[in-house]
Amino acid sequence: MSKVEAAPRIDQALAPSAEYLAWLRAERREQLTVRGAQLALLLVFLVLWEVLPRAQIINPLFTSYPSALWPTFVELLAATPQQASILTHTWSTVLATVVGFTAAMVLGIAIAAALWWWQGLYRVLDPYLVVANAMPKTAFVPIFYLWLGATFSIYGMSLAISLFVTVLMIYNGFQGTDPNKIKLAQTFGASKSQILTKVVLPGSVPTLIAALKVNVGLSLVGVVVGEFQSANLGLGYLIQYGSQIFKLNIVMTAITILAIVSSLMYLAISWLEAVVMRRR
C-alpha cells in the first residue's frame, strides 16, 4: 500500500502576521468606504439635478436634466451637413489635448533642464516665468487666432496654459534632488550630463508624474477655451453653439463628455504612475 505524502508544511516565519492581516482588512474597508461615499455623492448630485428642475425649484432652461443627456447624445451621433457627429467633436478635442499636453511636457522638461544646467539663466528668467505663469491666458486667444489661425491657435492656447507651470514644477523638482547623491556621483567622476540623466531625472520621477497630472487638466482647459473662440469643431465649440441657441441639453452633454474624457486621462496617468513607481 503506497504511503500518502504529507502536505508541505508552511514556514510560520513566512506567514503574514495577524497584525498585518488586520491592517489589510482595515485598508480594504477604508477603500470600500471611500468608493461608496464617492458613488453616493455622485448619485445625490444626479438625483438633485433631475428633481429640482422638474419641481421648478430651479429653471430647467438653465440646467437641463440628466435623463435628457442620453437622448441628446444619440441625436448628436448622426452627422448632418450642418453639424459633425459628436464623436468627431470629441476626437478633435482629445487630439488637440494630447498634442498640447505632450508638447508642454517635452518643452517643459527641456527648458527646466536648461535652467538647471545654467543657473545664471534661471536667475535671469525667473521673474518672467512667474509673471507669464500668473497672466490670464484667455486674454491671448484673439492674438493666437491672428498669429496661428483657427486650428493652430487651439494648440497654442493649450500649450500656453500648461507650459509655464510645467517648467516651474519640474525645475523645482530638479532642484530638490538629494545633494548627497550629486556629490557622490561627482566623486566617482560623473560629468554634468551624466548627473542630469542618471541622478536628477530619475530622482525627479514623482515630480514628473505630478506635472503629468496637472497638465492633463490644464491642456484640456486650454483646448476648450481655444475652441470657444476660434473653432468650428470640438466639444468647446459644441458648448458655445448650444448656449447660443439656448439648447442646454447639448451644452450639458458636451460637458459630461469632457468630464468623462478628463477622468479617463487622469486614470491613465495614475496607472502609469503605479507602473513606474513599482519599477523604481
Predicted regions and their residues:
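Transmembrane alpha-helices and adjacent helix-loop boundaries
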Residues: 135-140
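Transmembrane alpha-helical segments of polytopic membrane transport and secretion proteins
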Residues: 1-41, 267-280
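Hydrophobic alpha-helical transmembrane segments of polytopic membrane proteins
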Residues: 236-273
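Periplasmic/extracellular loop-to-transmembrane helix junction in inner-membrane transport proteins
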Residues: 24-27, 55-102
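Membrane-cytosol interface at the C-terminal ends of specific transmembrane alpha-helices
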Residues: 150-215
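Transmembrane-helix boundary motif in ABC transporter permease subunits
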Residues: 99-129
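Alpha-helical membrane-interface segments at transmembrane helix boundaries
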Residues: 33, 87-99, 122, 129-132, ...
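Short hydrophobic, aromatic-rich alpha-helical segments embedded in or entering the lipid bilayer
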Residues: 64-75, 230-243
